[in-house]
Amino acid sequence: MESKNRAKLLVSVLAIVIAFAVFIKPLVSTVKQGLDLQGGTHVVLQAQETPESKVDDDAINRSIQIISRRVNELGLTEPVIQRQGKDKIIVELPGVKDPEQAIAMLGKTAMLEFKDMEGNTVLTGKDLKDSKASADQSGQPVVTLQFNEDGAKKFADLTARNVGRQIAILLDGKVLTAPRVSEPITGGNAQITGSKDAKEAEHLAILLRSGSLPVKLEVVENRTVGPTLGQDAKDASMKAFAIGLAGVFLFMLLYYRLSGLVADIVLLLYTLLLLAVMKGLNATLTLPGMAGIILSIGMAVDANVLIFERFKEEIANGKTLRAAVNSGFSRAFTTILDSNVTTLMAAAVLFYLGTGPIKGFAVTLALGVLISMFTAVTVTKFILGALIGSNFTKNPAWFGAKAFQPKAKDGKGEAAR
């Protein structure tokens, strides 16, 4: 039995330590990071009601879809686009190199119109099938338009009726170009000239491809975090995390000895599982989120403290180490459960009512609490039970506890004669 427990102890401890050493660095580097850690742009867009467009759920949802297409076309990785309230849209663009140009693209309505000399709108962006940036024969940047079947017929009719005359191509009411028609164009294609460079042509093509916004959007908040500032915040947070974790490890080891060592090893597993779950859920790690992780580590340690104190009380009452472990965990479980349920309720409220960073804090806190329930109770009990069952020592002092002292019959604390 002792050899079996020793094998359990050795395998479990080695598995945790090796897994931590192998996976901690890849997990830390691949967990999705928020703007405050890696830099980027945070924009809040507010829908503006006009006589032509009404702000409702459908308009906001369609706007989110169009903005998502524009952001994806820009090639930005892991953007965050979500609704806030009834008329606002939050857009977070991590690692964006040209925030001003990106912001300009996000809120641009991009209403394309083809008008004749009388001012009649003949075609709109709805008649487009595709748009691409390219260069003409002289090397100048242009945007090539491809119309859908209905649009091709309209464009052929427009050019046939206006040979020798100009037609205007407008974007959001501003004339982009006004070419003179030399002959009817029946191929279903057109070109927009006037872009100052290839980048501007590409952005115009993206706007036209993604479609026009159903409502006007105005930038009401714009915050940019530089990559250097984000890296500094990340480094400071990691340093604080490492110092705090080392302090907890040292305290548990000095005060609870072998029990504390078990708790420290389990904390390694806790940290690993938390990062793995965050990566699996594609959760974003922010500065408030790191605060939530540190707080949840404190709660995991608090659970161990409750268990170990009950464990010490049971030993002081004369129970064997194994009986004290079982009884200590049973007595502490209700208190731990109550505390964690209360924290989960608070995290749920923060997530429901909060936005952005507050939600990040709530998510990491809730995940940490749930994982700590598993590690602090189940894993700690398993390893501690294997340690005691291996008969490494029967001295309670090795577990930070005092040995049972029988009371004297006269109640004065002296041994009966």
UniProtKB/Swiss-Prot annotation:
Transmembrane segments: 9-29, 236-256, 258-278, 288-308, 333-353, 360-380
Recorded superkingdom: Bacteria
Pfam families given in the database record: Sec_GG, SecD_1st, SecD_SecF_C, SecDF_P1_head
Keyword Transport: yes
Record GO cellular component, one term: plasma membrane
InterPro entries reported in the protein's UniProt record: SecD (IPR005791), SecD/SecF_arch_bac (IPR022813), SecD/SecF_CS (IPR022646), SecD_1st (IPR048631), SecD_SecF_C (IPR048634), SecD_SecF_C_bact (IPR055344), SecDF_P1_head (IPR054384)
Topological type in the membrane: Multi-pass membrane protein
UniProt-listed GO biological process terms: intracellular protein transmembrane transport; protein targeting; protein transport by the Sec complex
Molecular function in Gene Ontology: protein-transporting ATPase activity
Keyword annotations from UniProtKB, A to Z: Cell membrane, Membrane, Protein transport, Translocation, Transmembrane, Transmembrane helix, Transport
Cellular compartment(s): Cell membrane
Protein's job: Part of the Sec protein translocase complex. Interacts with the SecYEG preprotein conducting channel. SecDF uses the proton motive force (PMF) to complete protein translocation after the ATP-dependent function of SecA.
Record text on subunit structure and interactions: Forms a complex with SecF. Part of the essential Sec protein translocation apparatus which comprises SecA, SecYEG and auxiliary proteins SecDF. Other proteins may also be involved.
Family: Belongs to the SecD/SecF family. SecD subfamily.
Protein name, UniProt field: Protein translocase subunit SecD
Organism: Acidaminococcus fermentans (strain ATCC 25085 / DSM 20731 / CCUG 9996 / CIP 106432 / VR4)
The encoding gene: secD
